[in-house]
């Protein structure tokens, strides 16, 4: 294999390794964002359930329907 071909392959390898590292860091950052969004969603869901429970009339205490 010629020196030029080896140099070309080494250059491509360096760029590929850099791209892989960049993509890996992007995935790590996006996973952290996803974890944060999921935590916020769980909190909002819990708050919604609490609010609905406070507003719902107790069974048997519902006003009669009006016709």
Swiss-Prot record:
InterPro entries the record matches: SlyX
Pfam families associated with the record: SlyX
Classification via Gene3D superfamilies: 1.20.5.300
Sequence similarity: Belongs to the SlyX family.
Protein name as catalogued: Protein SlyX homolog
Organism name: Thiobacillus denitrificans (strain ATCC 25259 / T1)
Gene field: slyX
